[in-house]
Regions:
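Glycine- and acidic
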Residues: 1-5, 14-19, 45-47, 74-79, ...
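Gly/Pro-rich turn-and-neighbor structural signature
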Residues: 21-66, 70-72, 78-79
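Short acidic, glycine/serine/threonine-rich loops at helix termini
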Residues: 19-25, 55-60, 83-92, 106-107, ...
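Short Gly/Pro-enriched turn/cap motifs at secondary-structure boundaries
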Residues: 52-55, 84-86, 101-103, 139-146
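Internal helix-loop-helix
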Residues: 1-31, 35, 39-40, 88-92, ...
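A short core secondary-structure module
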Residues: 70, 74-128
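A glycine-rich, basic-preceded beta-loop-alpha segment at the flavin cofactor/substrate interface
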Residues: 79-81, 118-134, 139, 146-178
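Structured core elements
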Residues: 45-47, 61-65, 72-74, 79-81, ...
Length: 180
C-alpha cells in the first residue's frame, strides 16, 4: 500500500471545511455548500497565514467589510494548500478576517466562506469571485500540491459570508484543523 501526501491534502482539507460548516454554518450555508463538498464535486481550503501573521494569528490584517447580506473581503493569505486548481469546478475558501469594529488580537477574528465562483440559490455556479492565486509556493516534498499565495479583493472585494458568530473565527477554524 502507498499514498501520495500531495494529493491526500486536498480531501483532508475538504473534510475539515465540511466539519466547520457542518458545526457552525447557517442552514442556508449547509444547504448551499455541503452537498457538493461532501460529494467531492467541490473542494475546501483553510486560509489563516499572512506574511506578517504566521504563527501569530493576532496579527491577521485581512478585512471583512459588511455589504448587505454578505461581506467584502480584502487581503492576502500565504501557504494556502490546494488554493487554486482545476480539479473541481469550485473551491470553497474558509478565510479568517477582521470586521471593522473587531477587538484586537485573536478575539477579533471571524470566519468567512469565500467561494472561487459565487453559488446561485439553485446551486449552479455564478460569476467568478474576486479571489485568485498570486503565485505558487515551492515546498519540499509536496510538489503535486498547489500551495498558493491567495489574493482576496484586488478589484471590488471578494464576496464572503460569515460563518457562525462574529469574532469567534479562530475557535471555528480549530474545528477544521482538528478534522483535517
Amino acid at each position: 500500500n502507498s499514498a501520495n501526501m500531495s494529493f491526500a491534502l486536498c480531501p483532508l482539507l475538504n473534510a475539515g471545511a465540511i466539519a466547520a460548516i457542518s458545526h457552525v454554518g447557517s442552514a442556508e450555508q449547509k444547504a448551499r455548500y455541503l452537498p457538493k463538498m461532501i460529494s467531492g464535486e467541490w473542494t475546501g481550503t483553510m486560509n489563516l497565514t499572512e506574511s506578517q501573521a504566521g504563527s501569530d494569528l493576532s496579527a491577521v490584517r485581512t478585512r471583512a467589510v459588511p455589504d448587505g447580506d454578505h461581506y467584502r473581503i480584502f487581503g492576502q493569505k500565504i501557504f494556502i494548500t490546494w488554493g487554486e486548481h482545476n480539479m473541481t469546478p469550485n473551491t470553497i475558501h474558509l478565510v479568517l478576517a477582521r470586521t471593522p469594529d473587531a477587538p484586537e488580537g485573536v478575539k477579533g477574528i471571524s470566519l468567512f466562506i469565500v467561494p472561487k465562483f459565487l453559488v446561485n440559490p439553485d446551486g449552479s455556479l455564478g460569476a467568478r469571485n474576486d479571489v485568485h492565486a498570486v503565485s505558487i509556493e515551492h515546498k519540499l516534498g509536496i510538489h503535486a500540491s498547489p500551495t498558493c499565495v491567495m489574493a482576496f479583493g484586488d478589484q471590488d472585494g471578494a464576496v464572503g459570508y460569515r460563518v457562525g458568530e462574529e469574532n469567534k473565527g479562530l475557535a471555528y477554524m480549530f474545528i477544521m484543523m482538528n478534522e483535517a
